[in-house]
């Protein structure tokens, strides 16, 4: 789409999202894209990726709605609520998402062109050899603490002090999804009476099958 800023990437808890993210990194880094990856090597919910994009772009001339070429965008590797046999790439534009049909249609058309050509022309690198001769610079892969950024910024938009003062007891069920680490961190950061009632990670998404 012509953006030259960093790309923020995250993944959900599906079993194949990790390998899919690695494949995306191989292609992105091979094409000289600076990629912001989760410093904890954990799961990243879409709102955290969106917030990171907005924070970066807000510092540019014209802000989030500007036209600066070095705006950031992002990818969340997730098929959302679909079964574990499915995979997906969700593109987040500089606005933080969701992408409009112009963007998604362009991406789909380009991907199908490569598939029809048996991936001819797709550059890839070896993630274990970054910085070595013939490989991208290791500096293109940048650790980024999505969790800390998101949890700290949450207090800018929610009156969590009032919630804490009211003594509200909160039960949070991540439903096997990417927010599994975030709820506990929110409760700890803001001293809330918050219990994560089901912190298990459902890589097979069996909790969905229970409702089929």
Features from the language model and the residues they span:
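N-terminal small/polar loop signature for handling phosphorylated ligands or for N-terminal nucleophile
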Residues: 8-86, 186-212
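Phosphate/oxyanion-binding active-site loops and adjacent basic polyanion-contact surfaces
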Residues: 1, 41-45, 143-151
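Generic detector of short, locally flexible boundary/turn motifs and exposed helical patches
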Residues: 2, 26-29, 133-137
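Structural motif corresponding to the C-terminal cap of alpha-helices
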Residues: 2, 32, 57, 158-162
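Gly/Ser/Thr-enriched, mixed-charge loops and adjacent short helices
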Residues: 67-69, 85-209
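Short coil/turn segments at beta-strand junctions that form active-site/ligand-binding loops
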Residues: 3-5, 71-72, 166
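Short glycine-rich or small-residue beta-strand-to-loop segments that form or flank ligand, phosphate
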Residues: 6-12, 169-173
């Amino acid at each position: 789409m012509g953006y030259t800023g960093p790309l923020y990437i995250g993944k959900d808890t599906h079993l194949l999202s990790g390998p899919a993210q690695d494949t995306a990194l191989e292609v992105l880094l091979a094409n000289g894209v600076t990629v912001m990856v989760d410093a904890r090597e954990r799961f990243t919910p879409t709102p955290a990726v969106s917030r990171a994009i907005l924070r970066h772009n807000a510092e540019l001339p014209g802000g989030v709605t500007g036209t600066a070429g070095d705006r950031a965008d992002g990818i969340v590797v997730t098929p959302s609520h679909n079964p574990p046999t499915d995979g997906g790439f969700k593109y987040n534009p500089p606005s933080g998402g969701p992408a409009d049909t112009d963007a998604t249609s362009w991406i789909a058309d380009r991907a199908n062109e490569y598939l029809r050509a048996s991936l001819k022309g797709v550059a890839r690198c070896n993630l274990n050899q970054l910085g070595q001769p013939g490989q991208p610079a290791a500096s293109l892969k940048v650790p980024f603490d999505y969790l800390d950024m998101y949890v700290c910024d949450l207090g800018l938009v929610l009156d969590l002090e009032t919630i804490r003062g009211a003594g509200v007891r909160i039960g949070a069920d991540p439903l096997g999804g990417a927010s599994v680490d975030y709820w506990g961190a929110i409760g700890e950061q803001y001293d809330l009476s918050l219990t994560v009632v089901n912190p298990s990670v459902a890589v097979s998404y069996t909790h969905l099958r229970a409702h089929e």
